[in-house]
Amino acid sequence: MNLNKIIDSDSVGFPYQSINKYTCNINEFLYEETSLKNNHKNLLLIIDPQNDFMEDGSLPVKGARNDMLNLISFIHNNLKKIDKIKVSLDTHSYTQIFYQSWWQDSDGNHPDYYSIIKSDSKFKPLFHKKQSELYVKHLNKMNKDLVIWPYHCILGTYGHNIEPNLENMLSYFSLVTKKKVEKITKGSNPLSEMYGIFREEYSNLKLSSTLSAAYGHYENIIVAGEAKSHCVLESIKQLCEFYQFDNFNSNILVLEDCTTSIQGYEEKTDIEFKMLSSKYNVILTDSKKIVL
């Protein structure tokens, strides 16, 4: 089916009209293709493609609109070659450890957005004091920072939703291939950030061989989404931990034209990806060049 019957390319990444504009095409979708066999070859893992990460969102990633356009085209062009799609959704409430509401100084001020909370910070937790202070100490020991982010991806808000044109494409994929798109929520624990989809920032959780097997039977795990510097990078780092198990030998293909770093993190992120690609089967590629 022509792409313009599935999405409105001019509105990608912008506040958008009701889904009803495209429901008239659903019956056409249903009869366009027959069910396609799942060969367990290609898994598309889309990280946090949500409205709040678009350029007009509350935590904007400059370049996210083009990322979504490229990703939509990639799915459309490879409809018969993608065996499974999983989508993660950053899912928060207003009172979490990485938001202003959690911290206050002696004068009653909250930290600014993008502030870094250290163990010796003048800002003190208003909730779960002991656990919060331990969390910051553990992060600092791991050379990680607790960043105060703008409020984003609050459950029930427009910002939490998948970018609508991508959601149209996911619906199209599901209807014509008869394959369910799996949606995974992450990040609801108020006491920890959760960038990667498998484990929180500070956690005693060990990734298991059972979980490894759920991903390892795919030849290729294709990764896209936002933001490259945080949730995409950490998800790939956690995926790389699966290589310790005999049942995981997948290629991890990163679509670099379908993911963008938060501004200011680009150089550090590129260095980390180069390190991962030199050590593991992490392949940095492009949605227009990749052959499945």
Specify the residue positions occupied by each region the protein language model found.
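Active-site-adjacent betaalpha module
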Residues: 1-45, 49-87, 92-292
